[in-house]
Amino acid sequence: MSQAGQSSRTITLEEALEQLSLLESQLNQLQATIREIEVRIAQLTAVEDALASLAEGAEDALIPLDGRGTVLVPASIKKLERILVHAGLNVFVEVDREKALEYLRDEKAALSKLLDAYSREYARLAQYYSALRSAIESALQAAPPQAKSQQSQQ
């Protein structure tokens, strides 16, 4: 890439520190989102595994009444022929087992693509954050002692 295609702009130390802070916030938000997506993918995998193992039904099962499994009730599960799948906006659709599995796989694939995009963006921002932080540290070390003391007082 030519130098003419890149713009060069000098920023103040204060602007660099502000950018560093904003980048840190963005990195934290991206990291939290990445974790949420990873958890959701793991949940979908667990549901897919459960549907596979319960295909023929089960004599004894424990069904959680809440998301954390704090309260469980014993149950028997019939052969899984029709399953209710959340279609969005609090709408559930009754589908056969294969269609439910297809839905789960499609959702996992979409989330995996999103996870990949967010992970690449996180890596890009982390690299920029590291470079900016190094530049700030170099500037602070190169600053005259008087400027350093003024900076630390702010």
UniProtKB/Swiss-Prot annotation:
One GO process term, biological-process aspect: protein folding
GO cellular component terms given for this protein: cytoplasm; prefoldin complex
Coiled coil: none
Location of the protein in the cell: Cytoplasm
A GO term, aspect molecular function: unfolded protein binding
Alphabetical keyword list: Chaperone, Cytoplasm
InterPro entries: PFD_alpha_archaea, Prefoldin, Prefoldin_subunit_alpha
Entry's family note: Belongs to the prefoldin alpha subunit family.
Subunit: Heterohexamer of two alpha and four beta subunits.
Biological role stated in the UniProt entry: Molecular chaperone capable of stabilizing a range of proteins. Seems to fulfill an ATP-independent, HSP70-like function in archaeal de novo protein folding.
Name by which UniProt lists this protein: Prefoldin subunit alpha
